[in-house]
C-alpha cells in the first residue's frame, strides 16, 4: 500500500521537452515531394510548385490534379482544378470541380464565363465576365475587352 501511494504516483509523471525546426519551403524540394508523397505539402505549397512550371504544361496540370485529390472538399483546390479543366476544354470535369467551389468569388464567376463561352453561350459569358470584372478580376476584364473588340469587328 505504501508503494502505491508514495512511489508509483511519481513514476507515472513524465516530462518531455521536444525541440524541432521547421525548414522553409523550397519549391525544388516541393517538386520532388509532390511526386513522392504529396500529403506532406499544404495546398499553398502545391500552388507554389504548380506555378514553378510553365502554365498549361503537363506538370502544371498534374499538380492541380494532385491538389484536388489531396484536398477534395477545399473550395480553392476545386476552383483551380475547374480552371485547369476549362483550359483543356474538359467541360464535364470543369462542372464537377466548379460545383464544389465557392460560387461567390470573382474567380468562380470568371470560370463560369469561360464555361459559357466554351459552350457557345456568348451572352451569358459576357454577363459573367462583366460581373467578375466588377468584382475586380483582371482576367475577366481582359477577356471581356477582347470579346467586345471581336464582336464589334464582326458587327461592322
Where are these regions (language model features)?
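N-terminal targeting segments with Sec-dependent signals, encompassing both cleavable signal peptides
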Residues: 1-156
Amino acid at each position: 500500500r505504501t508503494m502505491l501511494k508514495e512511489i508509483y504516483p511519481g513514476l507515472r509523471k513524465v516530462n518531455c521537452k521536444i525541440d524541432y525546426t521547421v525548414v522553409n519551403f523550397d519549391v525544388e524540394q516541393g517538386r520532388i515531394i509532390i511526386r513522392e508523397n504529396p500529403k506532406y505539402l499544404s495546398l499553398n505549397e502545391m500552388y507554389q510548385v504548380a506555378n514553378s512550371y510553365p502554365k498549361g504544361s503537363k506538370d502544371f496540370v498534374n499538380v492541380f490534379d494532385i491538389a484536388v485529390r489531396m484536398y477534395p472538399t477545399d473550395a480553392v483546390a476545386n476552383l483551380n482544378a475547374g480552371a485547369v479543366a476549362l483550359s483543356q476544354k474538359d467541360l464535364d470535369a470543369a462542372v464537377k470541380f466548379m460545383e464544389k467551389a465557392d460560387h461567390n468569388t470573382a474567380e468562380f464567376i470568371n470560370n463560369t464565363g469561360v464555361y459559357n463561352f466554351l459552350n457557345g453561350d456568348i451572352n451569358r459569358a459576357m454577363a459573367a465576365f462583366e460581373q467578375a470584372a466588377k468584382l475586380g478580376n483582371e482576367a475577366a476584364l481582359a477577356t471581356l475587352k477582347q470579346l467586345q473588340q471581336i464582336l464589334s469587328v464582326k458587327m461592322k
